[in-house]
Amino acid sequence: MKIEKTALTVAIALAMSSLSAHAEDAWVSTHTQAAMSPPASTQVLAASSTSATTTGNAYTLNMTGSPRIDGAAVTALEADHPLHVEVALKLRNPDALQTFLAGVTTPGSALFGKFLTPSQFTERFGPTQSQVDAVVAHLQQAGFTNIEVAPNRLLISADGTAGAATNGFRTSIKRFSANGREFFANDAPALVPASLGDSVNAVLGLQNVSVKHTLHHVYHPEDVTVPGPNVGTQAAAAVAAHHPQDFAAIYGGSSLPAATNTAVGIITWGSITQTVTDLNSFTSGAGLATVNSTITKVGSGTFANDPDSNGEWSLDSQDIVGIAGGVKQLIFYTSANGDSSSSGITDAGITASYNRAVTDNIAKLINVSLGEDETAAQQSGTQAADDAIFQQAVAQGQTFSIASGDAGVYQWSTDPTSGSPGYVANSAGTVKIDLTHYSVSEPASSPYVIQVGGTTLSTSGTTWSGETVWNEGLSAIAPSQGDNNQRLWATGGGVSLYEAAPSWQSSVSSSTKRVGPDLAFDAASSSGALIVVNGSTEQVGGTSLASPLFVGAFARIESAANNAIGFPASKFYQAFPTQTSLLHDVTSGNNGYQSHGYTAATGFDEATGFGSFDIGKLNTYAQANWVTGGGGGSTNAPPVANFSVATTGLVATFTDSSTDSDGSIASHAWTFGDGSTSTATSPSHTYSAAGTYSVAETVTDNAGATSTKTSSVTVSSSGGTGGGTVLQNGVAATGLSAAKNGQLKYTVAIPSGAKSLKIAISGGTGDADLYVKFGSAPTTSSYDCRPYVTGNTESCSFASPQTGTYYVLLNGYAAFSGVSLKATWTN
């Protein structure tokens, strides 16, 4: 039964009707609300200055503090202004997912440690293909192009214009200038047709007024205007900077093996070339092995070198590797940033990077030293989209670690000159904000991540002596650039306005909302890290130091456990209230200004959570209680690799049937005997010549155990492949056949000056789907042309084809046979 194609046909018809006639269909809301709105009359902050005026045409930015923009500075964004959007879809079976997440993270549960693979998660909890097809059809009819569906179907990326966004989401987008930058923002919520209401979660990329910012703090004591509270130290010791590798000894982990079994990811933007160069300089100087580094670019656009952000990515990478002693692999997931000032950053790109780390499912720990005002993220739909992705990470045994923020309880307050967070006073020291108005940072407030706050660390050499709440008081924001307004540098922490309290939080708090941070590590710039940035040494702090320290520290513990622990929040909250010997409790200091904010106390508190932990002691506890004993599970049974194969001509279609009796299959690795490989679960492979090939499948389970099956596969040149995979002009490949979900692949080499390319299939029985893409192989979610026609009469036409190679895919929507494929063009 053609549910997918039928649903898609209906969706296209509905989309055409609603977009062309704006008629009768009801449109419904998503999680994406207006980023700015015009109140009737208010005191407003002029976009080009700090003076206030009264106007009835003022716009309010919908974030904490409600910043205001003079309406005279606001105009409509041009209809042809390019936009890149990420349409976030809703999870399926959310209640069942919550039950699974509770079980997979709780020692003693029958589900404990039985993590899902990405394909298993998508099958059980991802949107259906028919839902995806309907949304894709709607985007196409609205005018979006370059549409790509993420493997888990939670995100659909698309390129378009402001006009396409207006058509597709019944919103409008405005533009204005402030602080020397150009901004755009939707002043109406994003809507979708009612038929898509159960599918679409949010639409990201409709604004750039609130985006993620880095959370590192370069040591400049001369800029301090009002020192932080004098809380002393917990022991007579020094507050001094440390090399990243020193933190292993300071936090009790130097006796453990390095984290060489665990891959780690870092969310970044722009060019990472200089960061890797600096990382290699650090490891060489520290006597550590060169790191196996991978740069994974997410999305399209310009990946520019941003000198201001290089310090962030160097802080992340060098401190993770330093405290971990090395990692199996370090993956930089980097978003396009547009230019050297990263003006092209939106939440759409950052959320897509989170999702890529999850669908890759390689990194077991992912560091995010970024954040933004929680209210703005909730209004834009970013928070809802991020939470769905983080839930998949938990289900797969991955852990996102998020820096809590560097503006204390004033994450919401932005400097009127530069836009920096934490603004408290003007250059004269006059307080300009409500000091009792608190907020937290997103995505740190998510209940599906570990939120890491900051401390000021005291040591005697490389021996831990004490920690207090990180609070450096007020500093001039950017005196070298003429901005002498004053901001607070202090650890983020507090209570979410929107995220419900997770059940495991009840052991320490009666709040109905998510409370954080969970833990806290060194963050003060005065006790910060000495890292290599652009070839020189800098002393840097911030919760962007604290989060990488947790990631590297916990990577040692996960590595010792063969990555069997997974997301540790519920375990922390179950153990830490009573197992206090594992911890460095922080009992002095607060994270506000003039006695405001949250104050540290014995046990858990909103300033530093449980404090930091001793790596060695926690590893011993984890081995006894979370891995092999104390209800943590039994010895892992290895998986059993198995597969079957069907051949048609030179095409071999493999069906995986591997099993794992006490867990799940985490990854597949195929070798086809001709030098080709695949990591798909059940791949299809086209050989270039007839013969017998030795094919091997290696599967790895969720605990790292492996199994391999090897089998001989014979293919022949019969089966109508038309001269292998190359299609000749006007020569049909005939008698094509494949099983359901089987795939046949071809190429078409187009010479210079060619015109009127047509690629078509016809005849036969069953149902083959045609996909065509220039320059690279198409997939069922990434293509230049897909006709969406029932049966085997489909064609793709290109009036002015590009010179080069077009790639053709025939996919078995149902089993098909006797199909002909022909490419024709004129010279």
Swiss-Prot record:
Ca(2+) binds at D585, V586, A601, G603, D605. SMART domains: PKD, Pro-kuma_activ. One of its GO terms (biological process) is proteolysis. Its EC number is 3.4.21.101. It catalyses: Cleavage of casein. This is Xanthomonalisin. GO terms for cellular component: extracellular region. Residues 241-625 form the Peptidase S53 domain. The keyword DNA repair does not apply. Autocatalytically processed.
